Amino acid sequence: MFKSERVFDDNLLLSYFDDGYISDRIAIKDSEIHVWFLDIGNYDEYHMKSLFDILTLDEKAKMSHYVHVADQKRFLVGHSMLRILLSRYLAREPTDIILLNSKHGKLYMPQSNVSFNISHSGNRVALAFVKEKKIGVD
């Protein structure tokens, strides 16, 4: 089930889900920050396979370089859910999302008014989104 709650001065929307459902379209206002928290433990083998199919060949190759399975899972969930959420914000297919690396290695989406950042620790992944601004989450 998808859940959201506003915190601080109602401009920060904390979003999370525990059954894998995300609506087809997500709107983000100029004044909002959306932060999604994902628990890798909630994804079974079937969901992992579906998420793997969303990644590009380059992302799959990068994922395969991780030695530990836990690191591979973090990468898989983080990057595929990033694509899924961006697709909902921008009304595109997840596989049509083009992600590039900046000169400092930070992912970004060219020619988009939605900025994002990804962070992970243990079994958790955090994805933050904002419109017309830059964002970082750690």
Predicted regions, residues:
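Core catalytic alpha/beta fold that binds nucleotide/phospho-ligands
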Residues: 1-137
